């Protein structure tokens, strides 16, 4: 059996005491209850109950013993502190402390010496030595089997515990310093294992997809939306190119049909001699050809919009739905005005000549388009009944439009007279003076450039008239108004077709 021994030095008033796995009370505490004293008895295993009973029965005998007691703790110090009369024998030598322990606990347990010897052999107990350097860390508790074999766990009083704790800490420090090879490499191994444990975790965290922040998600959504809009614009552009190609093919076919019908100048004409070019191709610019193609597309789209509007009016659509069709018509008129504005800058004579119109429409043209005042007279009877306020507004619009038309007409007439006078200012003889001729042509071109301004003002007047009607009329009245305008120009185009298809008299 293993024991834990401690050597305690007493104060001058007390003698040295002997503790064999237990602490005894002083003689001054004779009348006290042993259960309430600070001395505690701790025995391991199955012998604890017998040991407590023994010490209780022999309490009186222990008080009569000599006060000089030897502590089982440190072997060398205890031998110097024990009186010779107590444990010294004859010259043969001192009592062995292990034999004293064996005899004492043999008496306590009532066991045979042979059983004690077998128990010591089975437990592999080493000779009792000073256990300053424990073979195991202090915080590791021994197993229950070792406790059963050893039998006792030495108790100590509070004073001895306080005195033994610094010595235990010192022994632990000495153990750590003396045997670095035993405990030193273990923390690095543990750290290495921990690092190995953390390694896959960190790599897995790096491999795991990171959730982007809201700003990145918003940017990704914006990029996707921009890409989607770009694809839609590209698709619309491709469709527009395809439709333009189809329109160009149709225009070429119309030119071929016109050439087949005999729209040529004579062989000695001023526009190409014997080249036999059609009139509409002799002096047509590229901008004029594009405008004719876009105008043909605009006519088809206008016809579709008018069919939808007529269907909505006939089926008595609600006011809000009907307003959508009316707004589409106004927007469509704005589109043709923009096309004419671009052509005015590049080829104003193409607009004024009316080559993009049918012959019947050309008869009623005024400065590259219809007269707004005449249009108001036509539709006034088609949008009745009108309120008094609406009637006054339309009459005022008609009057202001008529005044603007008269002013533009007078300006255009003055331009024509001035241009004619400039050209005929010099003698109209064939061998003319080249210096005077070039001066007259430069002056005439300068005056002719004002024609662009007249055409632009006329288009603005037509545009304002359309929008003013849209504002004065209700939604249903505006729908009937646009249907009447579309039907009017459709009949003019039909008249031209009928005129070309009429039977020829010989």
Curated annotation (Swiss-Prot):
The keyword DNA-binding applies. It comes from Nicotiana tabacum. Residues 213-257 form the bZIP domain. Keywords: Activator, DNA-binding, Nucleus, Transcription, Transcription regulation. Residues 25-45, 113-124, 142-152, 160-180 have a biased composition (Polar residues). One of its GO terms (molecular function) is DNA-binding transcription factor activity. PROSITE patterns: BZIP (PS50217), BZIP_BASIC (PS00036), DOG1 (PS51806). A motif (Nuclear localization signal) lies at residues 217-224. This is bZIP transcription factor TGA10.
